Regions:
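Walker A/P-loop
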Residues: 43-78
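Short hinge/gating elements
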Residues: 2-7, 22, 110-114, 157-158, ...
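P-loop NTPase switch/communication element
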Residues: 84-99, 150-151
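Pre-Walker A (pre-P-loop) alpha-helix and adjacent loop at the N terminus of AAA/AAA+ ATPase modules
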Residues: 14-47
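Conserved small/polar residues in nucleotide/adenosyl-binding loops
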Residues: 230-231
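Canonical AAA+ ATPase core
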Residues: 134-207, 215-222
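Conserved AAA+/SF3 P-loop NTPase catalytic/coupling segment centered on the Walker-B
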Residues: 109-132, 165-169, 186-190
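Conserved alpha-helical scaffold flanking the Walker A/P-loop in AAA+ ATPase domains
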Residues: 94-112
């Protein structure tokens, strides 16, 4: 690979990162580490798990990122009574045709927000395993590929909170990053209060296409990483 050519491709493909960051900063006050982690997962094709108490803009950050990208987005609110079929889909009998037809679930989207994923029992959490690892879902006897790009962005509450279920190790391993979100700084909290009092709302419009993300990921895979950086 020609280094000069690769550098030029990186500059071209990374131009949208600044625009995404600017768009996120218009809505999210502070939380730089959160924004950076979401962008790393987006470019590295790795699922991201955000952990923090309610009210720290975890869900808002994910929704804002998805709104900045012209792609299909779905949100799954995990609750104790949720079923695996509510996540991946199921077979539905059609009286008209007298056959079973596939009804796809909300996991069939480019960006899937698994909100409060540890509010549901392990049986429901595991419904995402095949989708996250193999980018496909099996319903009945049929296997369906998921759209590209496919990214699961999940939020969870600290495990000591009431009504939470610990994520199985196999589920945790499917996430590339786990980001623990802390409270914003004092000045940031003051700014959040002022924005809420003034009713400031920023309209978020798509500035990026899904195909551009796929192309950027190809460039990321070409970046050379010496083994000393991850073995020392």
């Amino acid at each position: 690979i020609d280094i000069r050519e690769l550098n030029e491709r990186i500059e071209r493909q990374s131009a949208f990162v600044t625009n995404l960051t600017t768009g996120m900063d218009q809505v999210i006050v502070g939380q730089k580490h959160l924004v950076e982690s979401l962008l790393i997962g987006l470019l590295s094709d790795g699922h991201v798990l955000l952990e923090g108490v309610p009210g720290l803009a975890k869900t808002l950050a994910i929704k804002t990122l998805a709104s900045l990208i012209d792609a299909q987005y779905s949100r799954i609110q995990f609750t104790p009574d949720l079923l695996p079929a509510d996540v991946i889909g199921t077979m539905v009998y059609s009286q008209k045709d007298e056959t079973f037809q596939v009804k796809k679930g909300p996991v069939f989207a480019n960006f899937v927000l698994a909100d409060e994923i540890n509010r549901a029992p392990a049986k429901v959490q595991s419904a995402l395993l095949e989708a996250m690892q193999e980018r496909q879902v099996t319903i009945g006897n049929e296997t369906f590929g998921l759209p590209k790009p496919f990214l699961v962005l999940a939020t969870q509450n600290p495990i000591e909170q009431e009504g939470t279920y610990p994520l199985p190790e196999a589920q945790v391993d499917r996430f590339m990053l786990k980001v623990v979100i802390d409270y914003p700084k004092l000045e940031e909290e003051k700014l959040i209060i002022r924005q809420n009092i003034n009713g400031d709302k920023f309209e978020v419009k798509p500035i990026l296409k899904a195909d551009e993300i796929i192309e950027a990921r190809k460039v990321v895979r070409q970046v050379y990483l010496d083994c000393l950086l991850y073995t020392s």
